[in-house]
């Protein structure tokens, strides 16, 4: 469910915190995807058009989620997006009341759905079908099996997938959380992406936590209080309190305990919810856990064709596409570097910003059951032209305080001209990215001192990739529309070659 009414409230109160982007903009990113939310969407969207029933195999087992997973993963990989699917485990005890209410509503919806079908009321049946769906353990198991056969990372949450997704982002193992549940923000997920797994052609909605905090003038602790008061899965709501009232109360009292007691609620219950948001139970993972694995064509064929009655021709085409994606080489996408200035801690003061959670902030299980394996990635190219890139440079010696800004066209050091020449080769190549492959360009220059590059790309973002090892040398900042400074790798006092495989413009 997430936080009740949060998105409409933010759309009105802090519209700058919410933006739309296309799937292509996420090329090269790694997404921690809430698997249960994704499977739920697939199961609702892919149904028999006559009776709105889920697609099934010869054993009567649902396969709608498998169709959806295949199609969406294929699209994500096509754009060079690395999906990391995160699966729920046993929910916390705090959520039992919410789950009981959902179970009751689902049973009521099933009764109404059957009645609508028997009466031939397809319009009502279509509206009700989403409320009857439950993602089962068997569906989760079959989804995990498919993903592993595709070489896609599978992460097991200790409890809530949303908390585990936020953990992966705060540990910099993934760049964004993809979920429909807004409580990922309350768990500390830096960016929330919605509609990533939607089957419809919806624009992806990005919610920026830092902009939310800035716009509401909350520190992270106050934001958690506000969201709990709006309504969450872990405690009851206070009568007559929605987002607008919750906002006013937090502004006035700045204490969850004071607010709850003022409204006649049970503070112990609210405190438990807050403690869980601030210190959820998660499994600990490392970089190997989120690496892409190898594709198993034989295993996929057996699972999809023999076990689930998919068309052999369809499966062969699907595997062919996966292998094609694998043979392409990824250029590390940089939306995360361009847009994600990670905070350092959960703040008590507004100036400190929201939290980038460390391991200590979570109740961590250090022995999760699944780990990742080898990585493969795909190319992503932009067709925007590279004209107008301006380059300035600074030179530094080992004393970083001794920095000389090179501003003139001609200069005693000669550094400006050599670096400008390096980028000038790209200025007029407006069709550079229309071809699949191109020769990397390089410029040899004297490295008597260490160089730093600073690019001004105006309304565009740029990234430079080192030809030799695909190391990101520098990236632009999409908010300030300025590049961060990227240091040239070669050691000072040597002559070296600075190779670029690509300049990406976003």
Swiss-Prot record:
Q: How does it assemble?
A: Interacts with PCNA. Three molecules of FEN1 bind to one PCNA trimer with each molecule binding to one PCNA monomer. PCNA stimulates the nuclease activity without altering cleavage specificity.
Q: How is the cofactor bound?
A: Binds 2 magnesium ions per subunit. They probably participate in the reaction catalyzed by the enzyme. May bind an additional third magnesium ion after substrate binding.
| Region (I-domain) residue spans | 124-253
Please tell me whether the keyword DNA repair is annotated for this protein.
yes
Species of origin reads Theileria annulata
Q: What is this protein called?
A: Flap endonuclease 1
Entry PTM: Phosphorylated. Phosphorylation upon DNA damage induces relocalization to the nuclear plasma.
Q: For this entry, list what GO says about its biological process.
A: base-excision repair; DNA replication, removal of RNA primer
- What spans are recorded as compositionally biased (Polar residues)? 338-347, 364-381
Record-annotated residues binding Mg(2+) 2? 181, 183, 233
The protein's superkingdom reads Eukaryota
Give the protein's biological function: Structure-specific nuclease with 5'-flap endonuclease and 5'-3' exonuclease activities involved in DNA replication and repair. During DNA replication, cleaves the 5'-overhanging flap structure that is generated by displacement synthesis when DNA polymerase encounters the 5'-end of a downstream Okazaki fragment. It enters the flap from the 5'-end and then tracks to cleave the flap base, leaving a nick for ligation. Also involved in the long patch base excision repair (LP-BER) pathway, by cleaving within the apurinic/apyrimidinic (AP) site-terminated flap.
Q: Where in the cell is it found?
A: Nucleus, Nucleolus; Nucleus, Nucleoplasm; Mitochondrion
Disulfide bridge positions per record: none
Q: Which UniProt keywords apply?
A: DNA damage, DNA repair, DNA replication, Endonuclease, Exonuclease, Hydrolase, Magnesium, Metal-binding, Mitochondrion, Nuclease, Nucleus, Phosphoprotein
- The record's gene field reads FEN1
Name the Enzyme Commission number(s) assigned to this protein: 3.1.-.-
